[in-house]
């Protein structure tokens, strides 16, 4: 049975950005970062009103095809509730198409907002964290960014074949508590990157020794992120995707080289073009100034908790 939500319920979802891969953990490792989109959803008597402020406001659709709206509708359906109308306000701070998980954050934020509306009506209904990971990953097609935004901290994520052929894969993730000394800095170029394009640069087959290398570094990354940050340089090495994408990301590749030569563990953030740097030391002022002079935004970011939802009654 579907329950109709009363008019005047309002929730705010605050959802973090994320960085995927972290070097060796292609489509597996993710990290939640302290840069947030806010999604305010209010139930109304009829229709859909959507407003978008900040990043991407001029580029995304202001209607039912907006990813946040589709995620809200999917979340309401999964929670067994329905709204006669919705007012949706998106306040975006996460840059779009830069490798910081903006689409995953939109999906997670919309689903979490829908879950908040359901639980505002009845605390016994709604979606579990596992369901939020599953549903948001279905939008993405892989769970690394989405699960990081749901759970916070660092995540190891994976997928399994569906129980019924034709269904969605089963997506799962386990949260890692990041060592408190680790700091994150994102160097964000102005140009955008297409995930589809950069994925298209990857070979279908890889040498066994490269697969073995990345398996070892992915395991080491778990140790480095949680207990041994002194191992971050080795733990962020990769042979499967960064060099292959380098021709499409010249500025990114150059800055990864600059930072690693300076002893800072740097990787492509997701599909790029953002550079993610992880360290236990403050980011060098001279490198920050040089990056800005090269047209990069320098964002010093906390390691974030997962999506948060607050509820009010209008």
From Swiss-Prot:
It catalyses: L-homoserine + ATP = O-phospho-L-homoserine + ADP + H(+). GO terms for cellular component: cytoplasm. It is an enzyme of class 2 (transferase). Transmembrane segments: none annotated. Its main location: cytoplasm. It is found in: Cytoplasm. ATP binds at residues 95-105. This is Homoserine kinase. It comes from Rhodococcus erythropolis (strain PR4 / NBRC 100887). The lineage of its organism: Bacteria, Bacillati, Actinomycetota, Actinomycetes, Mycobacteriales.
